[in-house]
Design a protein with these regions (language model features):
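Phosphate/pyrophosphate- and phosphate-bearing ligand-binding catalytic cores of soluble enzymes
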Residues: 18-19, 155-282, 286-301
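Short, basic and Ser/Thr-rich N-terminal targeting/leader segments
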Residues: 57, 64-66, 148, 219-220, ...
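Structural signature of FAD isoalloxazine-binding scaffolds in flavoprotein oxidoreductases
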Residues: 32-33, 38-44, 71-89, 135-166, ...
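Short, flexible micro-motifs
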Residues: 35, 68-72, 105, 131-135, ...
Length: 301
């Protein structure tokens, strides 16, 4: 049995360490069993120390940002969940912003607007943190993180920091280098273009208006559940298979947008995974298209 509190007590306060923490409190789905240990570093140095300690103790760890695009299994997560949400710095440097991984994507987009920088409007309504968005190359409305990220500061499992410039980031559709090398995104630098604050704000408001109209923002959801196959619209296929409103327990296909799955009450991960499996089966039978989940599924099976 790992004495988690002792592992981190020399450099974290007691209120930065939680034991048996329900992950349902930390995901936008509102689903997930308990993590053995949940830690909340507040500086890059604390994050490095946490990673060094878990590596030395041979304890598995998982990096958590805003909990969007994430489905945690009902048995929870073994080892340590490292929450980046207290890393909150934003530094303005000319046409660039250096943004800590834990800053929400919406907050980063607002900061860009306030500095009269255009190019991040697409991200204003993307849920989760900027670190998570950079990790998965999140995108919307014909924009994606690969368009604006020029460098990433990351931390490896030995606690060492590295800077990767744009050419090394291996960005592709919902993919980045950090899905390959396992390093933790600590901070990103985005390069934007000078713009008119009013025009930027109007565009952000328009994108958010469209989201409110088309997406079930009032429900517990992880965003788009499936990656978009070339030449198809996922929501349209699911709807044409008669699955709009279809449910397994409290896991349900949104009536507002069939590409979104929602927790309509107290859904379990098992409910949601069974719903995902049924959708995949029906779409494959109807279209011959194999849907791939965009949502990351983690935890003890």
């Amino acid at each position: 049995m790992v004495a988690y509190t002792e592992l981190f007590s020399s450099f974290l306060r007691r209120n930065q360490i939680k034991l048996n923490e329900p992950m349902s409190r930390h995901t936008t789905f509102g689903i997930g069993g308990a993590a053995d240990c949940f830690v909340m570093p507040e500086t890059i140095e604390e994050l490095q120390k946490v990673i060094v300690e878990v590596t030395k103790a041979n304890v598995p760890f998982f990096i958590l940002g805003g909990g969007a695009n994430l489905l945690v299994r009902d048995k929870g997560i073994r080892g340590v969940v490292i929450y980046t949400g207290r890393l909150q710095s934003i530094i303005h440097e000319g046409n660039r912003l250096r943004v800590a991984a834990g800053v929400s994507t919406a907050k980063a987009a607002k900061a860009a607007m306030e500095h009269g920088l255009s190019g991040m409007e697409f991200a204003a309504g993307i849920p989760g943190t900027i670190g998570g968005a950079a990790y998965m190359n999140a995108g919307a409305y014909n924009g994606e993180m690969a368009d604006i990220v020029v460098s990433v500061l990351s931390c490896n499992q030995n606690g060492q920091l590295s800077v990767y410039n744009k050419s090394k980031l291996h960005y592709d559709y919902r993919h980045s280098l950090f899905m390959e090398n396992g390093e933790i995104i600590v901070e990103i630098t985005v390069e934007l273009a000078p713009g008119n604050i009013h025009d930027i704000e109007v565009m952000m408001e328009e994108f958010n208006r469209r989201r409110r109209m088309k997406q079930p923002l009032e429900k517990k959801s992880a965003g788009s559940t499936f990656k978009r196959p070339a030449g198809y619209f996922v929501g349209q296929m699911i709807e044409e298979m008669g699955l709009k409103g279809f449910a397994v327990g409290d896991a349900k296909v949104s009536m507002k947008h069939a590409g979104f799955l929602i927790n309509d009450g107290h859904a379990s991960c098992t409910d949601m995974m069974n719903l995902i499996s049924e959708i995949k089966r029906r779409v494959f039978d109807g279209y011959g298209v194999e849907l791939m989940t965009e949502v990351q599924i983690v935890g003890e099976e």
